[in-house]
Amino acid sequence: MARFAWTRVAPVALVTFWLVLSLSPTDAQVNLSSVDFLDLPALLGVPVDPKRARGYLLVARPADACHAIEGPWPDNHSLDPLVLVRPLGCSWEQTGRRAQRAGATAASVGPEAPGQLREFEDLEVTVRCDQPARVLLPHAEPCPDPECHPVVVASWALARALALAASTLFVLRQLWPWVRGLGSRGTAVKTQTCQKAQVRTFTRLSDLCAICLDDYEEGERLKILPCAHAYHCRCIDPWFSRAAQRSCPLCKQSVASTHDGSTDGSVGGEEPPLPGHRPPIWAIQARLRSRRLELLARTVPCRRCSSTTSLGVAENVAQSEATSELS
C-alpha cells in the first residue's frame, strides 16, 4: 500500500519541484485608463474647446523637453497624442514648439513666471495643468528596453518559499505511513522471534533431558525450542550463555532470542497446543504413556495370559490414538 502511494505521489512531487526551481519569462500588461484633470487654458493660441480636449497622454522624453522630444508615438486612431512635460527651466514657448514638432496636438506644462507667456497661433491647444497632472511625471528615467518589465523580488521569493514548503509537507505526509510501517514491521518480527522459545511447566512424566540425562518430573520448568526439543531451564540457560551462537544441543538448529525472549506458561495434556504449532514428540509420548497406564489399571488380570492379552490390547489402542494425533 505504501509503495503504491509513493508511486502515485512521485510524479506530482517531481513536477512541483521543477516548477518551483525553474525560471520562466514574465510579461507585464499595463491597463490604460482615462483620467480627467482640472486645467486652465493658456493666454494665447486658439481657445480651449468648452467640451474639453481628450487625447492620449504621453510623457515627454526628455521629461523637461529642453531638447528635441522623441517621436513619433504609437498610432491611436481614436485619440490624439498629448505631451506631459516637467518644467525644469526651459521656456514655455520652446517646450510647446518641440511638442508640436514631435507630432503632438497639445502640451501640458507647468506655469512659468507671470507675464512670460507669449502666444503663437499655430499650436492648436496649450493647457496649463496644476498638481494632479504632475503626479504622472516619473521621478526617474523610464526603462529604455520595451522588453524590460519590473518584477517584485520579495513577492516572487515568498511565493517560491511557500510552494517549496507546501510540496515538502505533502511528500512527507505521503511517506510517513510507509516509514511507520517499516518500524512496526521490525518490532513485530522481533516480538515473534522472542516468542518462539517458551517456558512451560511440566505436569506429566515424560522423557529425560538431553543435557543432564535426568527424567522430567512433575512441576519442573522446561524450555521448548522452535525445533520442538525440550530441556530443563537450569540446563539450557547456561548452555546458551556459554555458546557463541545459540543453537539446539541436539539438532544444532539456530534459535535466536531464545534466552532473553522466553515466556512463561504451563504444559499439560489438557492444554491445547499453540495455534499454528504441532505438539512436541515428548508431549505425545507422555500422553500415550498415561493412556496406557489407565488402560492397564482398568483391566484386572486373573492369569498371566490374560494379563499379556490385556497389555497387547492396551498397546494397540494407544498406537491407534498416537497415529490419529500425529495425522
UniProtKB/Swiss-Prot annotation:
Reaction catalysed by this enzyme: S-ubiquitinyl-[E2 ubiquitin-conjugating enzyme]-L-cysteine + [acceptor protein]-L-lysine = [E2 ubiquitin-conjugating enzyme]-L-cysteine + N(6)-ubiquitinyl-[acceptor protein]-L-lysine
Alphabetical keyword list: Endoplasmic reticulum, Glycoprotein, Membrane, Metal-binding, Signal, Transferase, Transmembrane, Transmembrane helix, Zinc, Zinc-finger
Glycosylated sites: 31
Membrane protein topology class: Single-pass type I membrane protein
EC number: 2.3.2.27
Any one GO MF annotation of this record: zinc ion binding
Gene that encodes the chain: Znrf4
Superkingdom of this protein's organism: Eukaryota
Spans within the Cytoplasmic topological domain: 172-327
Membrane-crossing residue ranges in chain numbering: 151-171
Protein name: E3 ubiquitin-protein ligase ZNRF4
Pathway listed: Protein modification; protein ubiquitination
Assembly, per entry: Interacts with CANX.
Presence of the UniProt keyword Zinc-finger in the record: yes
Zinc finger (RING-type): 209-252
Localization annotation: Endoplasmic reticulum membrane
Signal peptide: 1-28
CC per GO annotation: cytoplasm; endoplasmic reticulum; endoplasmic reticulum membrane
Entry keyword annotation includes Disulfide bond: no
A biological-process GO annotation: protein ubiquitination
Organs and tissues of expression: Expressed exclusively in spermatids (at protein level).
Protein's job: E3 ubiquitin-protein ligase that acts as a negative regulator of NOD2 signaling by mediating ubiquitination and degradation of RIPK2. Also catalyzes ubiquitination and proteasomal degradation of CANX within the endoplasmic reticulum. Could have a role in spermatogenesis.
Biased composition (Polar residues): 256-265
UniProt main location, coarse: endoplasmic reticulum
